[in-house]
């Protein structure tokens, strides 16, 4: 494997001159630059990325910290981030935090030590104080952290209200909500939207709200109990599509037909929701665009460009599948 010294010898220049050509820093005459570039090509020399990052204190690498890579929403987000980064010759470093604050803090410290250029994070545990004095720029994705941390998210509150209204229009009279974890901002906003639409209904009871933790298995378990104890429920708003799948599994096990006896609507618009039978009705986020927008925003900050807008809030769209149709 060719080294920088081999290139210097072939081009009959110093190692320092080769370094200036590689890093495009300092003065090098045009003739010398061509000699060095020719030597690099003929020797098939690949600059050491670690050494360059130490020299330049940057690595052309972005870290994406996600809470649960098993949730199909997050790989779709990651694809949007990565595709944008690839157009700018940045590399993506993927980190899975499991909603663990210690892991998130450790990742934040790691990216500073490794000269990672910036971080896109989906977190419900870190606060502005955890971000404030970091040496790398941070963009919050899906779950805003605070006014001073740039963010990309959707209108969860309004989207959940639309979801419940759709269930009402499908003829549902008793609508339950399988919510996500407590103290997770998007989960809380979707819960508030549901409550706004049904809280004053004469039939409403808080027993119609259970927590599925954004987990398909947990959701199937709590939905089994919910429907067994409250057979009058004829509509369920699941806090995300992943949980909507758990709802449908529970309905199958109980012999409840979807949508003839139970209407189900999710939130997110993940591709997997289109592969279920019946196909899930959902409030679709522009998932891919969320990832691309977060990456574009972060790169503008890293490159010192003018940032006219620090917080992006996208609207969601009703995608009528087959889980809310009534004969």
Report the location of each language-model feature.
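N-terminal helix-turn-helix DNA-binding module of bacterial transcription factors
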Residues: 1-59, 73, 245, 325
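Short beta-strand and adjacent tight-turn residues that come in two discontinuous sequence segments
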Residues: 116, 121, 177-178
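Amphipathic helical "hinge" segments at domain boundaries
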Residues: 45-110, 114-117, 192-195
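Bacterial carbohydrate/catabolite-sensing allosteric modules
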Residues: 42, 83-88, 106, 136-140, ...
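Short beta-strand segments enriched in small/hydrophobic residues
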Residues: 15-20, 54-70, 166, 174-181
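ATP/adenylate-binding site constellation spanning eukaryotic-like Ser/Thr protein kinases
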Residues: 15, 33, 59, 78, ...
């Amino acid at each position: 494997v060719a080294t920088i010294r081999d290139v210097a010898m072939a081009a009959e220049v110093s190692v320092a001159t080769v370094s200036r050509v590689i890093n495009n820093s300092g003065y090098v005459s045009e003739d010398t630059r061509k000699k060095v570039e020719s030597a690099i090509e003929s020797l098939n020399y690949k600059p050491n990325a670690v050494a360059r990052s130490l020299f330049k204190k940057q690595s052309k690498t972005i870290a994406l910290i996600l809470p649960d890579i098993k949730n199909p929403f997050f790989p779709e987000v990651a694809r949007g981030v990565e595709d944008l980064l690839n157009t700018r010759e940045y590399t993506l470093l993927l980190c899975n935090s499991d909603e663990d604050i210690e892991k998130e803090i450790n990742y934040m410290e790691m990216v500073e030590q490794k000269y990672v250029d910036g971080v896109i994070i989906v977190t419900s545990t870190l606060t502005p104080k955890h971000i404030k004095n970091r040496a790398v720029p941070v963009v919050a994705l899906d779950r805003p952290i605070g006014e001073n941390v740039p963010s990309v998210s959707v209108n969860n509150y309004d989207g959940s209200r639309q979801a419940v209204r759709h269930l009402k229009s499908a003829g549902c009279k008793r609508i339950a909500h399988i919510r996500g974890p407590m103290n997770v901002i998007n989960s809380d906003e979707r819960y508030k939207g549901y409550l706004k639409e049904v809280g004053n209904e004469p039939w409403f009871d808080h027993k119609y709200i259970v927590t599925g933790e954004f987990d398909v298995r947990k959701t199937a378990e709590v939905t089994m109990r919910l429907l067994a104890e409250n057979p009058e429920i004829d509509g369920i708003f699941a806090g995300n599509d992943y949980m909507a799948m758990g709802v449908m599994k529970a309905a199958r096990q109980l012999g409840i037909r979807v949508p003839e006896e139970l209407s189900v609507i999710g939130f997110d618009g993940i591709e997997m929701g289109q592969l279920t039978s019946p196909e899930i009705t959902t409030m679709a986020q522009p998932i891919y665009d969320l990832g691309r927008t977060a990456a574009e925003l972060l790169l503008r900050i890293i490159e010192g460009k003018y940032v006219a807008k620090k917080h992006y809030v996208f609207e969601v769209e009703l995608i009528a599948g087959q889980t809310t149709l009534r004969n």
